């Protein structure tokens, strides 16, 4: 009897062992997947905002790619500083190499953001507002914001590369193009997404800055992307749409998409407290100790000459000293002979309009006020040692 019991028990163990080998479902204890991530309202908000953080980070490659290849700025070599194997000179002369990396950074950064937005959009489409305590309008707004963010990434790709793949799904890659599509298809996708998203987005209802809408895509933000799309339509798809561009821009000014106001100073949008500026339609928020670290070099350390922190009384940058990377492209040769370029030479062109207040030498006036836009000549400063 005892032997029979042992045999039966052994057979049961063997059978259960065989059956368990075919069940490979995992219970995750040390990881979070989309299936078990969305539990609270705060989880949804965190997921929705993740692609925004990536978008903020990704702008730096765009800024370098656009500015260094244009005519108004250069990165000149200063003795052995800023040569970097001719990297910046190649960008300015439009002779860059695949090893430069700026174009690849822009391409990869945008598509990473697109796939992050695709993930969030599809995850929210599988869930309901009631499940997390949202109203339908709130839930639809969150989805629409990621659609606009995705369109913003595609607008950058269209501007930089024209022919790019069109990826609209994270989970079902059969919905994505197998390769590049023509610019018209990307253009149409951007326009459709923005138009469909606008009614689902929030609208700014009063003056005094974006307030609780800071860093969110609103109706005016999406409309402003349409303005940019239409403004460059001739370049993108060979068809002018200036009338459409003018209409949407005027609608923004007239308050159709929210309450905004053109500032009475040219530099108001760049004040330290620009979150109160009603000219700002969309901006990624940043603050010391929060999301700002990505720009500590190109925004702070490399935009003004060494020792400028003493001259400007700049205490905000605690990441390192200044070492200027950018300069205005020159208007004169080293012997004082003027250049005769068709483009560039911003200083000489500003001097054609002596009443332009931006031509003054930059000076920090305190209380978030300044004058001028250029730094030139010798800088007088007093450091901590007098």
Please give the residue ranges for each predicted region:
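Sec-dependent bacterial lipoprotein signal peptides
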Residues: 1-19
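Acidic, glycine-rich segments characteristic of secretory precursors and extracytoplasmic regions
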Residues: 8, 21-80, 92, 184
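Short, well-structured active-site flanking segments
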Residues: 24-27, 158-169, 239-242
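Short, surface-exposed recognition loops and adjoining beta-strand edges that mediate ligand/DNA contacts
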Residues: 35, 61-81, 167-170, 202-221, ...
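Elongated scaffold/linker segments in the mid-to-C-terminal portions of large proteins
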Residues: 42, 48, 85-109, 258-386
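Conserved, well-structured interaction surfaces
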Residues: 45-49, 53-58, 81-161, 177-188, ...
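Extracellular structured ligand-interaction cores
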Residues: 141, 148, 163, 217-219, ...
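TPR/Sel1-like alpha-solenoid repeat signature
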Residues: 223-226
């Amino acid at each position: 009897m005892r032997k029979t019991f042992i045999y039966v028990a052994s057979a049961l163990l063997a059978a259960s062992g065989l059956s368990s080998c075919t069940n490979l479902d995992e219970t995750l204890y040390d990881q979070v997947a989309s299936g078990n991530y969305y539990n609270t309202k705060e989880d949804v908000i965190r997921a929705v905002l993740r692609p925004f953080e990536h978008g903020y980070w990704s702008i730096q490659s765009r800024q370098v790619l656009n500015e260094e290849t244009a005519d108004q700025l250069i990165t000149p070599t200063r003795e052995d500083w800023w040569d970097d194997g001719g990297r910046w000179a190649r960008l300015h002369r439009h002779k860059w190499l695949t090893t430069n990396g700026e174009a690849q950074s822009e391409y990869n950064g945008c598509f990473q953001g697109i796939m992050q937005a695709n993930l969030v959009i599809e995850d929210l489409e599988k869930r309901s507002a009631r499940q997390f305590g949202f109203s339908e309008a709130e839930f639809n707004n969150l989805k629409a914001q990621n659609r606009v963010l995705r369109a913003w990434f595609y607008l950058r790709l269209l501007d930089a590369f024209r022919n790019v793949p069109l990826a609209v799904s994270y989970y079902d890659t059969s919905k994505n193009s197998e390769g590049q599509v023509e610019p018209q298809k990307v253009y149409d996708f951007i326009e459709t997404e923005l138009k469909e998203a606008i009614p689902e987005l929030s609208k700014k209802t009063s003056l005094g800055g974006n307030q609780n809408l800071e860093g969110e895509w609103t109706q005016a933000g999406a409309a402003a992307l349409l303005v940019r799309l239409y403004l460059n339509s001739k370049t993108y798809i060979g068809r002018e749409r200036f009338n459409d561009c003018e209409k949407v821009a005027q609608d923004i000014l007239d308050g159709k998409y929210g309450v905004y106001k053109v500032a009475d100073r040219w530099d108001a949008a760049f004040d330290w407290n620009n979150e109160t500026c009603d000219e700002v339609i969309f901006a990624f928020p940043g603050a010391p100790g929060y999301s700002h670290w990505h720009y500590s070099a190109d925004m702070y350390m490399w935009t003004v000459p060494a020792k400028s922190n003493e001259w400007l009384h700049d205490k905000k940058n605690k990441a390192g000293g200044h070492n200027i990377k950018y300069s205005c492209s020159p208007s004169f040769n080293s012997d004082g002979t003027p250049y005769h370029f068709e483009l560039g030479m911003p200083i000489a062109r500003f001097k054609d309009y002596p009443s332009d207040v931006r031509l003054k030498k930059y000076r920090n006036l305190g209380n978030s006020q300044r004058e001028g836009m250029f730094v030139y000549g010798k800088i007088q400063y007093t450091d901590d040692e007098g």
